[in-house]
Every structure is written in structure tokens, then in C-alpha cells.
Regions:
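Secretory targeting and sorting signals
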Residues: 2-45
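Extracellular attachment/recognition segments
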Residues: 45-396
Length: 396
């Protein structure tokens, strides 16, 4: 952990704002990847020439989600607190509370969302600067039925419980302006199955299915999304220290095949439950947020680059860039120009590829009129690692 030891896990986010001008975007390279390694490459050229309006018109009208929420757990050692409003959101308009029951174990209460607590999905990402990870343990209604409880566990990459900042996001299911599909993969050993209807959503009206390809390896089929781009977020589910990441996603005919890999803390393939969300021209909540964006960090060794065009999006319609944060490997800052929404909202992130890795976030933050989000990636020993990733942000 020598390269990451200098980080201060609990340094306030706001003090980390890097007030420097971002370098001009460079043409992205593929870091030596073959075309087959690119997500959705089978139809990427076709998609680039297809107007977004045509892409959306082929999708049946889907209602907006009934409930969305997110939270920034920024006081990891405090037993009870109310998170900052600027970093959290509850579509019910009621309050949010976080309770720490023991080291690394948290319960988030979203008041007023109980009627939606037995459906939907939850995304979680560790936040900060240290090698760590956070998983979703479960989401359920409380004893009154009025409120939504989301349980989160956090760990070191070695698998020891750890007090860690985190970000968590919930949606009950829906999509308005683009494509947002998800599954809760609850049966890690079944060869092939259909996830429970309440815990999956398909914006084209289809039924998602999951296939177990081998130890720790899964294929999620999302029938219908007529896109060849988008972004994927994966979160390990359960009370163990295993972790999951996106290996790749490929446009089907029509639809998406999303490949997910899960590992033990040592990096050995391990069967595990997970949640997975795919979004294209939308955000992870599916509510068509006024401010949101995503990108695929596909060239982690370059000092600055423009991510692959078909795998980035933002509501301002501009072009995102990624800047490496020297002197360490594994540190990058994603920036969406003219999305000056300040230090608020939710950011998520996931390591990409078949090599086991952990990617955490530190954002979103406002820098020089841009919206930015830092991403830090580590290997299973806790060393900073240049690896590919996906990241998403949105403001409720």
C-alpha cells in the first residue's frame, strides 16, 4: 500500500477542490485494447450516425420512477447524523438519517419512501481516498412501512470491516428521457434465471434475464435497448467482503449483454449477488435529471484524454475529458464542461475489465465552471492501479 499511504481518508471533500485549469482534451487512445474489448463495439459505428431522437422514438413510453433518492455518508465514525442536504436527495421531500451500528456497518433511512421499499435497485460506491469498498446489504421497508431502509457495509480491500464514507443511490424503477435498466441478481449459482419482477426494470418493456457463465462470471441480458453506447454501474450485494465489477457490455440484436465479474478480497473469482444498472442518455436513477453525466475511463495512463464519444454523455451536450492526477497512478479527474452545478449531487463508479480492481470516487465537485468527479482505483493489495472504469453523476 505504499503508493496510497499518503492519502487522508477523512479529509473533507471541499478542501480538495483543485482550482486549476484543465488541459485541452487530447484525442483518446485505447490503451492497447483490441476492438473486441470495447463495450458495445459491435454497433458503435452505426450508433454514432443515428440521431438521438430516432433512438428514443423506438422505445415505448415509460413512466418516470415513483421514487428516487441518494445520500452521501460523509461521517463514517459518527453513530447518528443527518447528512448534508446539498449532497443528498429524497424525492418524498422528507428527511434522511444515517445510523452506524458498528465498524463499517450503516443504515440509511429515507423517510417517506416505504411504499417503494420492496422494489427497485440500489447503487453504492465508497467515497474518499483510501483503498476501500462498500456494498449494499439490503433495502427494505422499516417496521412502520412508511420509510425505506438501505443497509451498507464497508471494507478494506483485504476484507476487514472499515469505517468509510460512501455514496448510495436508490430508484424504484422508471425511465423518461433515455434508457435506464437494472437487475438485482439474487441467485449467484443458478445457471439461468429471471430476476424478480419488482427488482428489475427494462425501459423497453422486456424481461431481463441472467446467466451464470462460471465461477464469479455472469451475463445479464437486457432485451430491447436500441443503443450501442451507455454506461454500467455494478454493486456487490450482501454482508461479505466480495466485490463485483463490469467486464464489458455488448449491443445485442436488439438489447444489451452486460458481463459482470465478482471476486473474493484476494481476487479469486467468487459467486456473489449484485445489482447492475445500465443507462444510456439518462442517469442511474432513470428520472431524466436536469444535470447528469457519465463516461467510460478508457485510457487511464494518458495525462489527459477525451473518452470514447459513444460512451460519454452529459445534459449540457458538451464533451467530457479526463485528466490524470500526478504523481500517482490510478488517480483521474473526469470533467464535464459547462455543467456548473457545484459541489452537490451523487457520483458512482465501477472498475471495468476482467482484472480484479476497486474504483472509488471523490465528487462530484465544481471546478472552474465545470462539473468534475475524481476516481481512484486500486488493486487487491491496496496499491493504486491504472485501470479502466465507468463513472456516473447526477443531481436530484
Amino acid at each position: 500500500m505504499s503508493s496510497s499511504a499518503q492519502h487522508d481518508q477523512f479529509r473533507p471533500r471541499r478542501s480538495r477542490l483543485r482550482r486549476r485549469a484543465l488541459p485541452a482534451a487530447a484525442v483518446a487512445t485505447m490503451s492497447g485494447l483490441t476492438l473486441g474489448a470495447l463495450p458495445g463495439v459491435a454497433a458503435a459505428t452505426q450508433h454514432q450516425s443515428r440521431p438521438a431522437a430516432v433512438q428514443r422514438s423506438s422505445r415505448p413510453a415509460i413512466a418516470a420512477p415513483g421514487a428516487v433518492a441518494y445520500v452521501y455518508g460523509n461521517k463514517p465514525s459518527v453513530t447518528n447524523y443527518t447528512p448534508k442536504r446539498v449532497d443528498s436527495f429524497n424525492s418524498s421531500g422528507e428527511r434522511i438519517h444515517i445510523h452506524r451500528s458498528s465498524t463499517g456497518k450503516y443504515q440509511v433511512t429515507f423517510f417517506g419512501l416505504g411504499p417503494f421499499a420492496s422494489q427497485g435497485t440500489v447503487d453504492v460506491t465508497a467515497e474518499g481516498l483510501m483503498p476501500e469498498q462498500c456494498n449494499v446489504v439490503r433495502w427494505v421497508p422499516d417496521s412502520t412501512g412508511a420509510n425505506l431502509l438501505v443497509k451498507v457495509d464497508c471494507w478494506t480491500v483485504a476484507g476487514a470491516v472499515l469505517d468509510s464514507p460512501f455514496m448510495a443511490a436508490f430508484t424504484s424503477g422508471g425511465s423518461t428521457t433515455g434508457t435506464t435498466d437494472f437487475v438485482w441478481a439474487y441467485n449467484p449459482t443458478a445457471h439461468s434465471y429471471t430476476p424478480q419482477a419488482a427488482y428489475q426494470f427494462n425501459s423497453s418493456g422486456g424481461t431481463n434475464t441472467i446467466q451464470h457463465l462460471g465461477a464469479g462470471r455472469y451475463e445479464v441480458f437486457l432485451p430491447g435497448p436500441v443503443v450501442a453506447d451507455g454506461s454500467v454501474k455494478v454493486t456487490a450485494y450482501g454482508s461479505n467482503a466480495n466485490f463485483c465489477q463490469v467486464d464489458q457490455w455488448i449491443a445485442a440484436s436488439p438489447g444489451q449483454n452486460v458481463f459482470v465479474d465478482c471476486f473474493s478480497p484476494a481476487g479469486t473469482p467468487a459467486n456473489n449477488r449484485f445489482t447492475m444498472t445500465f443507462t444510456a442518455s439518462d442517469d442511474l436513477l432513470g428520472d431524466g435529471a436536469s444535470f447528469s453525466g457519465y463516461l467510460w475511463g478508457n485510457d487511464p495512463t494518458s495525462s489527459t484524454y477525451t473518452p470514447a464519444a459513444q460512451y460519454q454523455f452529459d445534459t449540457a451536450g458538451t464533451t467530457a475529458t479526463v485528466t490524470k492526477l500526478p504523481p500517482n497512478p490510478g488517480e483521474g479527474q473526469a470533467s464535464w464542461p459547462n455543467e456548473a452545478d457545484g459541489d452537490q449531487g451523487d457520483q458512482q463508479g465501477t472498475a471495468y475489465g476482467s482484472t480484479p480492481a476497486h474504483c472509488i470516487i471523490d465528487g462530484p465537485i465544481g471546478i472552474n465552471g465545470n462539473e468534475a468527479g475524481d476516481v481512484f482505483c486500486f488493486d487487491t493489495s491496496g496499491n493504486l492501479l491504472d485501470t479502466l472504469y465507468t463513472t456516473q453523476w447526477m443531481v436530484g
